[in-house]
């Protein structure tokens, strides 16, 4: 740890671990389960300790814990031309700092993130492939003060829905064409005294494309088109919403690949 101005020091030993299991009910399918516990000691986020009683970096505080559980499955269908995946996940973060009504602080804060992840990868023909993915997640402050400016119990900077789709086709003369779409739900900003900024960003769709040509077995050239319709969107925001990272505008990248 880096000492603060008053020269604080702290040392301890923490154990983070993960365990998992896999079961194959059929040759073409599997079911798995994972569980993990990770711990972050006071000062672990920025390697700085604090003497403030309500600060998570105070060495007298207990480590913050994250417990993550995942249950998923994978199946190969249609002579292995289609792969389907799905997973349920849940993460609980505990021991967060909470200010009590009497002004004292405790580590009763708890946040929860849980959701569902779906994926599909298919080969419609030897030349035509498709990949799709969808994630839905619910987030909330289970115990403690809300963190979102809109007053809801949801967490900030986390879209509820996300989707992606990509398809590609290989022509017999070395040309490959591909295209797809990306969707992200809106992002909530944090609570503070900012005035005039929205409580959340808008959801958005972005479309991309790609073309590549194989010159020979050792070289190919590739052309990527990002944000085809030049959609203006916010990729990320800070707590107040005064600063944000705009999404990538319409752009093109040319690259060459060589294999020896």
Q: What are the residue ranges of the model-derived segments?
A:
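Signature of Gram-negative outer-membrane beta-barrel scaffolds
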Residues: 1-29, 42
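Residues that define the transmembrane beta-barrel architecture of outer-membrane proteins
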Residues: 11-15, 65-69, 112-114, 153, ...
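Membrane-embedded beta-barrel scaffold of Gram-negative outer-membrane proteins
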Residues: 24, 30-38, 60-116, 120-142, ...
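C-terminal beta-signal and adjacent terminal beta-strands/loops
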Residues: 183-192, 212-260
């Amino acid at each position: 740890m880096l000492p603060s101005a008053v020269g604080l020091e702290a040392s301890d030993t923490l154990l983070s671990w993960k365990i998992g299991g896999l079961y194959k009910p059929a040759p073409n399918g599997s079911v798995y389960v994972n569980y993990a516990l990770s711990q972050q000691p006071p000062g672990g986020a920025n390697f700085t300790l604090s003497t403030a009683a309500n600060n998570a970096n105070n060495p007298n505080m207990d480590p913050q814990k994250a417990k993550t559980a995942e249950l998923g499955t994978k199946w190969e269908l249609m002579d292995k031309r289609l792969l389907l995946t799905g997973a349920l996940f849940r993460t609980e973060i505990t021991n967060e700092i909470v200010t009590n009504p009497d002004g004292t602080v405790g580590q009763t804060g708890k946040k929860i993130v849980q959701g569902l992840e779906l994926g599909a990868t298919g080969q419609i023909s030897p030349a035509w492939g498709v990949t799709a993915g969808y994630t839905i997640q619910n987030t909330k402050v289970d115990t403690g003060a809300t963190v979102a400016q809109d007053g809801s119990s949801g967490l900030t900077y986390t879209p509820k829905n996300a989707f992606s789709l990509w398809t590609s086709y290989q022509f017999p003369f070395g040309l490959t064409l591909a295209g797809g779409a990306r969707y992200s739900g809106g992002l909530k900003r944090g609570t503070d005294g900012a005035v005039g900024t929205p409580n959340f960003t808008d959801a958005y769709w972005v479309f991309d494309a790609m073309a590549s040509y194989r010159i020979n077995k050792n070289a190919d050239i590739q052309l990527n088109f990002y944000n085809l319709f030049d959609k203006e969107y916010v990729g990320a925001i800070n707590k107040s919403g005064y600063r944000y990272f705009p999404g990538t505008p319409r752009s093109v990248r040319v690259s060459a690949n060589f294999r020896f």
